[in-house]
C-alpha cells in the first residue's frame, strides 16, 4: 500500500513512526497540620479519581483519533489512581492538513478525525514532606501514537484539564518509515519546539525552558507558573489568618519547592 505525506512523499506501506508524548503536571499546596494534609489528599483523590481521569483520556483519544479497545482503571488505597487505554493500531483513513503544523491542537468538541493508534495511560502520585508543610500532587500522562497524527495535538486539551503549577513535557519520535524508493524517514513533520503546540494565552502564564536534541528527535519543555499568590497554595483558609512572618516563611518554602521541581535539583540540604 502507498501513502502520501503532506510533503508529497509517497510511503512504502503504512507510516511506522512511533510518536510519544509524556505530560507531567504538579500541584503544590501548603498543609501545616496532619488534618490539613489528609483533607488535601482526600480532595485531590476525589478531584482526580479514576472516573474523571477516564473521561480526560477518552477526550484525548478522540483528539488523536484513536479507537478504544479496552479501558483498565483503578483507584488505589490509601490514595492515587491509574487508567490505561488500549487502542487499536491501523491504517490512516483520513489525515487533516493541520496534523503536520506546529500549532495548538483542538478541544474535544472540534474533533472529527477517525484514526487508529496504540496506547494512552495516566497515573497519579500524591505525596507530602515528612516534617514540613508541603504536599504535592503529580499526574503523569503518556500518549503514544503510531502513524501520521502527532500526540502533541492533545497537549492543549491536557493543559486545560489540570490546575497545574508546574509542567514537564517530553516528546520523541522513534522508528522509521520508508518511501517507495526505500529511503528511511525518521520524522515526518517539522518541529522546533513543543511550545509551538501551546496557545499564547497559556504560554503567558508560565516561565518556559526548552532542552531539545534535534538530531535525535527529542524535545523537552518545562513550565513554571509566573505569578505567585499565596492564597492559591493554602488549603481551607486564606493568608489573612497568618501573620506577616508566617506568610513570608510559607511563601519561601513553597517557592523553594517549586524551584527544586522546575530545575530538577535540591537547593536546601
Curated annotation (Swiss-Prot):
What is the cofactor note?
Answer: Binds 1 pyruvoyl group covalently per subunit.
Query: Per its record, what are the GO molecular function terms?
Result: adenosylmethionine decarboxylase activity
Enzyme Commission number: 4.1.1.50
**Pfam families per the UniProt record, alphabetical:** AdoMet_dc (PF02675)
The question of whether rRNA-binding is a record keyword is answered with no
Q: Which UniProt keywords apply?
A: Autocatalytic cleavage, Decarboxylase, Lyase, Polyamine biosynthesis, Pyruvate, S-adenosyl-L-methionine, Schiff base, Spermidine biosynthesis, Zymogen
Q: Which cofactor does it need?
A: pyruvate
Q: Its catalytic activity?
A: S-adenosyl-L-methionine + H(+) = S-adenosyl 3-(methylsulfanyl)propylamine + CO2
Point out residues bearing the modification Pyruvic acid (Ser). 118
Modification comment: Is synthesized initially as an inactive proenzyme. Formation of the active enzyme involves a self-maturation process in which the active site pyruvoyl group is generated from an internal serine residue via an autocatalytic post-translational modification. Two non-identical subunits are generated from the proenzyme in this reaction, and the pyruvate is formed at the N-terminus of the alpha chain, which is derived from the carboxyl end of the proenzyme.
Q: Does the keyword S-adenosyl-L-methionine apply?
A: yes
- Share an example GO biological-process annotation for this protein: spermidine biosynthetic process
What positions are marked as the site Cleavage (non-hydrolytic)? 117-118
Please name the catalytic residues of this protein: 118 (schiff-base intermediate with substrate), 123 (proton acceptor), 146 (proton donor)
GO cellular-component terms in the record?
cytosol
Q: In which pathway does it act?
A: Amine and polyamine biosynthesis; S-adenosylmethioninamine biosynthesis; S-adenosylmethioninamine from S-adenosyl-L-methionine: step 1/1
What family does the database annotate?
A: Belongs to the prokaryotic AdoMetDC family. Type 2 subfamily.
Annotated HAMAP family: AdoMetDC_2
Q: How does it assemble?
A: Heterooctamer of four alpha and four beta chains arranged as a tetramer of alpha/beta heterodimers.
* Function in brief: Catalyzes the decarboxylation of S-adenosylmethionine to S-adenosylmethioninamine (dcAdoMet), the propylamine donor required for the synthesis of the polyamines spermine and spermidine from the diamine putrescine.
Name of protein: S-adenosylmethionine decarboxylase proenzyme
| Gene expressing this chain | speD
